[in-house]
Amino acid sequence: MPGKRILVVEDDFMNMRLTQHILKSEGYTVLKATTALEAIEQIKATPPDLILMDVRLPDMSGMTAVRILRENASTRDTAILALTACAMKGDRERILQMGCDGYIAKPINIRDFITTLRKFLDPGRQKQ
């Protein structure tokens, strides 16, 4: 599925750089945002095929941004995966209940990361 556009919403420079490197090496087009508001505006201008949303962002919670995107008809069905260090018991379930389609824990396991992306970029995808 190379050529698909993936928006990475991440405020940490090193995490953004690593994620971007992995995605580009797999042939994906990477769009970047460092805040939730920047992401929302960018999505309006250039809708991505998939969004990787950090949960903790400087301007608002990534989950608040997910709620805003889910309320908008043009982004309601866009795949959104939480990309987060929140790995306590119950975090995954809470994040999925808040509107994310999937969950990827940091630090990233590259093989699992790519497998998960491919699963959600498949047109016949199912929620995790």
Regions found by a protein language model. Name each.
Residues 54, 84:
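Active-site residues of response regulator receiver
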